[in-house]
């Protein structure tokens, strides 16, 4: 059984500290003047194209260079919060951060669907029902 939980949206984010120092990009071309943090080659990614922000607004299929590569979404967030540069992050991850600002909010990245999947044989068990309710309550908290 598969139940869709949520669409996870990705945007480009930077810290207050970084954006005060380097300025807020106003156009896609402005991104070329900024430092980017990205996924390292071969690192497992939650999206099909983890480097989409490096290619956003760049012509001829080229991409910007990243100044730092990490192997997890949390690593990206920590580097952004530390003021290292800009990075593409899932919206839910930054929802509780007071230090991170969405850059170019109309430039949305890929959308990833998150699903709750379990075997048919566990459909009516208390354990699955409790966990499903927990997941939907947490998603409700994040969306509000």
Language model: regions and residue ranges:
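C-terminal regulatory
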Residues: 1-114, 140-144
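Short amphipathic alpha-helical coupling segments at ligand-binding clamshell hinges
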Residues: 123-137
């Amino acid at each position: 059984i598969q139940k869709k939980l949520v669409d996870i949206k990705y945007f480009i984010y930077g810290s207050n500290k970084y954006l005060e120092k380097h300025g807020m990009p106003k156009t896609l071309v402005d991104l070329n003047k900024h430092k980017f943090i990205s996924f390292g080659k071969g690192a497992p990614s939650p999206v099909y194209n983890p480097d989409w922000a490096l290619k956003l607004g760049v012509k001829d299929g080229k991409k910007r260079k990243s100044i730092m590569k990490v192997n997890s979404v949390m690593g990206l967030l920590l580097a952004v919060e530390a003021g290292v540069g800009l990075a593409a992050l899932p919206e839910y991850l930054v929802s509780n951060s007071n230090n991170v600002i969405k850059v170019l909010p109309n430039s949305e990245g890929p959308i990833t669907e998150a699903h709750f999947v379990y075997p048919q044989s566990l459909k009516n068990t208390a354990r699955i029902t409790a966990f499903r309710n927990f997941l939907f309550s947490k998603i409700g908290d994040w969306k509000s």
